[in-house]
Amino acid sequence: MLLLIISIGCICLLVFYNICRKGNSAASSGIIKYHIIAHNMGGGVDSKEGFENAYARGTRLFDADLRFSKDGELILCHEWEGVLGYFSFSKEDIYYNDINVGQVERSLLPSKEEFCKTKIDNQYTMISFADVVEQMKEWKDIYIVCDAKEDVEETYLSICKTADYNPDVLNRIVVSLYRADDFDIVKDIYPFKHLAIRQYENLPRSADEIINICKEKQINIVNVGTAYCDTDTIKAYKENGLFVYAAVVNDISYFDKLRDIGVDGIVSDFIYEDMIDAK
């Protein structure tokens, strides 16, 4: 009798998991039909110009590097090293957290207004997350893949606040995180529909570890560093119903090879959706 009860329980859990996974797949259907995530919003720099150009080229998924300004507003900047000389902090002011992401004390940073008035290389206009939200209201078909460079809880609370908890905006936010526990933090803030986990060299984990996290947290997208893009790893992900985006890829012939082993899409600086042939 005990064995029968245990067996029934296991079957129920399996059915529940499959229902949840199918639900997540349906929710993410708007995302997975696209092959390209624009790295740094497109063009190698988190800028207004890169964002607009990538959209014009058919790209609809955008990787947004989120940091805080001096006045506590979300701004987009991949690395502080990339904007040295434009603001008052120096290279010596940059320190690194436990996953090797550069940080600067907030008091040394520009305000949101100062940041957004800055043009990198006299051509790229810096943007805030508020700017992105306004564009999301106009472009109803875009999704923002959020890369929280600072505290996850503070970042996602600010995302929701900046979007005025508007479901039309927040339902097109892709929560993309490194740590399993961070998904619990984010789920307590808002029931985001799209979840992705990152497998990069700065936090090494095996495919089995990633798969187990995906099962536990109901994640169905994996953002994989190219160092992990071997046939066995990708096969394991696909066999478990996961959608795989490789990062960062700027060689379209390499992407073709990745697609042959099951990779669904890539994070890229200079490859756009209009360059991709349907497969």
Model region roles, listed by residue range:
Residues 1-279:
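Phosphate-group recognition and catalysis centered on beta-loop-alpha active-site segments
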